[in-house]
């Protein structure tokens, strides 16, 4: 099965549909995204260029099964299609975070949260992003 994201006029994903691979074969018998787009246009009354193929096995710029990643992430409803970078990405989690177009994921302006020590792990601690302080704050889930 192939998956296609239906885009709204603002490049937001408004639906994701599956398509039988046989419905996107070109004259040479090879899967072709444009054939799938044309099929979806005919059967869903939505312009072909507003259907973008997405891979269920792609996330964070990597293919879960070791294959070639397709477009950064599997497109979900509400995701944004970035045509310039050929990626789908989710909602920005915090105002200060920046998009890494290689991994199609958001990152804090100071990098990833620090690694937890064994003691912190045993205390069920974790780091939460503090947008006001632009910092990772250590918190305890049991508190």
Label every model-predicted segment.
Residues 1-143:
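Interaction-interface detector
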């Amino acid at each position: 099965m192939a998956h296609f994201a239906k885009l709204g006029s603002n490049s937001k994903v408004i639906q994701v549909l599956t398509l039988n691979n046989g419905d996107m074969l070109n004259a040479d018998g090879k899967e072709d995204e444009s054939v799938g787009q044309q099929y979806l246009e005919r059967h869903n009354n939505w312009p072909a260029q507003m259907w973008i193929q997405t891979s269920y096995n792609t996330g964070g710029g990597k293919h879960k099964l070791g294959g070639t990643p397709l477009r950064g992430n599997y497109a979900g409803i509400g995701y944004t299609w970035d045509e310039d970078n050929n990626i789908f990405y989710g909602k920005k989690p915090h105002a200060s975070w920046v998009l890494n177009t290689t991994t199609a994921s958001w990152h804090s302006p100071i990098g990833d949260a620090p690694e937890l020590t064994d003691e912190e792990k045993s205390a069920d601690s974790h780091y939460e992003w503090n947008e006001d302080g632009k910092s990772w704050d250590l918190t305890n889930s049991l508190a």
